[in-house]
A protein has these predicted regions:
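Catalytic cores of alpha/beta
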Residues: 81-106, 119, 125, 191-227
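Hydrophobic faces of well-ordered beta-strands that scaffold small-molecule active sites
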Residues: 2-10, 54-56, 82-86, 110-112, ...
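N-terminal beta-alpha supersecondary unit
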Residues: 14, 18-61
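C-terminal helical cap(s) of enzyme catalytic domains, especially alpha/beta-barrels
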Residues: 123-127, 221-223, 227-252
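Conserved anion-binding
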Residues: 10-29, 95-181
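N-terminal active-site wall of soluble small-molecule enzyme domains
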Residues: 45-101, 189-193
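Short, acidic/polar
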Residues: 33-47, 91-96, 153-164, 217
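Short, small-residue-enriched loops and turns at beta-alpha junctions
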Residues: 60-65, 90-91, 144-146, 179-186, ...
Length: 252
């Protein structure tokens, strides 16, 4: 199983995401860097873990602001390609992202988050612009429930949402309970991850939220996960490069 480090951006700094309460996020304090700037944290991931990719959640863009390309470019200049979560929820934004990266391949994957899209039709419109291979769908939950206010999603349930996305041709899915992020209590979506793996062996299954120890990673691997998203435990030293390597976990 691979490890994908996570950067949550708010303003111009990397913040410590806790339980999805974004208004309360504060700049990250990290053993990997002297400050909380994106470039310092990105450089820390490269230096200490040999990372070549990073998941970037631009919380301002997710909230409706424009993507911040200068910041993304600066982060990419540290040696990282980005899995970018910037509120991609429409064909228009997909076209803007495609145009912005056409001659500058700093983005490895584009994230479509369930919390941002109103309906399955919006995802289909995005796929008219972006190849399905470029897209990762994030099955966003909060305390085990669908994290979306629109009835079309709420009526489906998590497994049906995942099946719908699979039918569209998307082959990478993140299972993330926002209430568990940064809490260090372990991943609470193991049963759902196992169900999704049983549903299909075709997709890349990614999970995160609450990972703090090697045991958490082993459990994710046992239920069929391919990639684990981690932030806090990398910053505070609970999971070091040496520990992860010795246990057989690698960075992309």
């Amino acid at each position: 199983m691979r490890i994908l480090p996570v950067i949550d951006l708010a303003g111009n700094v990397v913040v410590h995401a806790v339980a999805g309460q974004r208004d309360a996020y504060r700049p990250i304090e990290s053993m990997l860097a002297e400050d909380a700037t994106a470039t310092a944290i990105g450089s820390g991931f490269v230096k200490h873990f040999g990372a070549s990719e990073v998941y970037v959640a631009d919380l301002d863009a997710i909230g409706g602001d424009e993507p911040r390309w200068e910041l993304y470019r600066a982060l990419a200049a540290t040696g990282l390609r980005l899995w970018l979560d910037c509120g991609l929820a429409s064909e228009k934004r997909a076209a803007l992202l495609q145009k912005a990266t056409e001659h500058e391949p700093i983005i490895s994957r584009f994230i479509v988050g369930l919390e941002s899209v109103k309906s399955p039709q919006e995802i289909r419109s995005i796929l008219r612009v972006l190849d399905a291979e470029q897209v990762v769908f994030s099955l966003d939950l909060r305390n085990g429930q669908i994290c979306n206010a629109h009835d079309v999603w709420l009526e489906m349930g998590a497994e049906a949402v995942a099946a719908t996305v699979l039918e569209m041709g998307i082959r990478s899915i993140i299972v993330l309970d926002l209430a568990q992020v940064g809490m260090g209590r372990g991943v609470g979506t193991l049963a759902l991850c196992r169900t999704l793996r049983d549903m299909s062996c075709e997709w890349e299954l990614i999970a995160g939220g609450g990972i703090s120890h090697l045991e958490n990673l082993s459990k994710l691997e046992q239920v069929g996960c391919d990639v684990a998203l981690i932030a806090s435990a990398l910053h505070d030293g609970r999971l070091t490069s040496e520990k992860l390597s010795a246990a057989g976990f690698s960075f992309p």
